[in-house]
Amino acid sequence: RVAQIGKEAGIPDGVLNVLPGYGDVGEALGRHKDVDAVSFTGSTEVGGYFLKYASESNLKPVALEMGGKSPFIVLEDAKINDDLIDNAINSAFWNGGQNCSANMRQIVHKKVKDEFLDKVIKKVKKLKVGDPLDLKSNMGSMISKGHLQTVDGYIQKGIDEGAKLLSGGVSNNRQKGFYAKPTLFDGLKE
């Protein structure tokens, strides 16, 4: 659908191509001399391959987003139902957001943004943070005190830069363990 939107926006055929696949697809793109640029989101290891492929072919520009944190994109025709909301929340907060595929950015079309945010905020505020062995907990602790401090630093930066805090915020460290609050912002700067 993203490529279709690009076409509808007037991007000529062949300029924007979305080709999901595995290593052989990426390598073919990275090494092909007629491919003028490549953008990749994924692991640091695979990102390194794209730099190698570019250097061995036509020195094409390579845009890399390595280590994950891919966006969760909600298009204007999306049905804002429980499945979508649950997927949006789980993709961001599963394992405390401590995995490379966590969708820490949610890009939502303005047509459905209010409905989406309303439903997400209501469900996020109900998440129980606590001992991961407690079946009533939805989100466990950060891996270490240092990681919690890093997460709190990012949250504070969002607040300081004027993003609208919708839920959560900097942890209060009143619980035993390194528990971050499930936090939502709107209007973050790049």
Task: Tell what function each PLM region has.
Residues 1-26:
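PLP-dependent aminotransferase-like
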Residues 20-28, 42-49:
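Beta-loop-alpha module in the N-terminal Rossmann-like domain of NAD(P)-dependent dehydrogenases
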Residues 37, 45-190:
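ALDH superfamily catalytic-core signature
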Residues 32-38:
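Glycine-enriched alpha-helix->loop->beta-strand junction motifs that scaffold or abut catalytic
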Residues 4, 8, 31, 52:
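Short, well-ordered alpha-helices that flank and scaffold nucleotide-derived cofactor binding pockets
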